[in-house]
């Protein structure tokens, strides 16, 4: 099993322009879900395509597979970056960049800290219900102080890559 999630970053949209396959954020996710069996295959596929961000923003992705591999994909200045999970480590993500040279750009550091604390305390092992409760605890549904616009989590899903199930 393989799963992928996407999170919005308020930044210039990624627009790669080479001679590779052109895909948007959502079509790339669909392509990866249809064709990639694991994280390494997905990374190879992304390296061989040009990303064109949807929603006039930038995005980063977190992907995982049934073998316990996980990676975050970020596009910085239209260049693909891969941040792999450390062996025996945990990986989690909110709406700010985690690439070392731009770490912290964006929002959601408070929600990231909740993820970090909860997952660390539980050694990364949560039931489906506990996982959904954690996603609810870090979801957004508020009016932005910066723009006056509503900021909301669009969906939350708990994936079990071993059983190949998803809980909404």
Regions found by a protein language model. Give the residues of each.
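Short, surface-exposed helix-loop/turn micro-motifs enriched in polar/charged residues
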Residues: 53-55
